[in-house]
Amino acid sequence: IDRLPPYVFNITAELKMAARRRGEDIIDFSMGNPDGATPPHIVEKLCTVAQRPDTHGYSTSRGIPRLRRAISRWYQDRYDVEIDPESEAIVTIGSKEGLAHLMLATLDHGDTVLVPNPSYPIHIYGAVIAGAQVRSVPLVEGVDFFNELERAIRESYPKPKMMILGFPSNPTAQCVELEFFEKVVALAKRYDVLVVHDLAYADIVYDGWKAPSIMQVPGARDVAVEFFTLSKSYNMAGWRIGFMVGNKTLVSALARIKSYHDYGTFTPLQVAAIAALEGDQQCVRDIAEQYKRRRDVLVKGLHEAGWMVEMPKASMYVWAKIPEPYAAMGSLEFAKKLLNEAKVCVSPGIGFGDYGDTHVRFALIENRDRIRQAIRGIKAMFRADGLLPASSKHIHENAE
């Protein structure tokens, strides 16, 4: 446990709760926790199945066969990829559980794992919990991530056993095309490295862009697995259900460790997940469209304040470089300042890795009126610091 540092996000969470206890109205962009309702047809299926007396026993660690077949059809319909539901698919209690258990099942003390920096914390600390050594690969502006990945493999001793990837990225919202995965699979085969890809934001995409799956690459299943969670696409974060597909050996390894750790997900939840994957997908498009509208309001408002953040083309996040006058503070102190003075709560980039300390992350979990209120608070803070003249909407400084 000593290898796990205190969770940075707890610091801002505690400050947020303290402010709310004082009666302050805090606009919360900190956690990527969907605020919308799960689509009604999914909830109705859960309620119907939960009424049956034969659905309340232990499930199976791999997941019920009907759901694994639905997962296979989902990949076929979406990516034109064939997945064997018996040997290449497994249901997980959300992707976070699956990622952590997969690393426990496959990594030994002393193994090296390559992880982007910044990255979703479980990508880093799942390996740490398993006793592995993590080598960070910079995922930052102006650096070719694939070249850095290849260099890390060549220079690491012992040779890395696994790389953990996640695109669209949390927290950076960085995206890749299928060509990137083609190069990753070739690289992994050349150096005999396993690839774990987290496709959590497959559906949260904008402006006509589509997120590729690593499973679309011929031969990917020789070296790779991919996780998907229903949390974001279907507003099912609290339901804790997802799945992993791909390499048979890794699927079997995860199934074995899960057979000791859990009895799988509550059966009515799994049947509801079938309804999600096989039902009308307009609800998914509607959820993505809601995030897009929020993205547009937030980015436009920050630009009006002179905070020139990039417009993400996927994910539910805006990865915002700290304006130059505040850059020396680092992300945690800047996040505290936003909370105290603008009444806006964000995630400090340092919580995602050292290379994230120049940024903060906004999660698009507040409605548009609340986002506009947040922009007013940020502008007021900038004005108080002399960066935004009282009569102007713009900061006269180089914020990016």
Stretches with model-predicted labels:
Residues 9-12:
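Short, structured beta/alpha segment
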Residues 55-56, 100:
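Helix-loop-beta segment of a Rossmann-like dinucleotide-binding subdomain
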Residues 60-63:
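Short beta-strand to alpha-helix junction loop
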Residues 2-7, 17-27, 33-49, 76, ...:
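PLP-dependent class I/II
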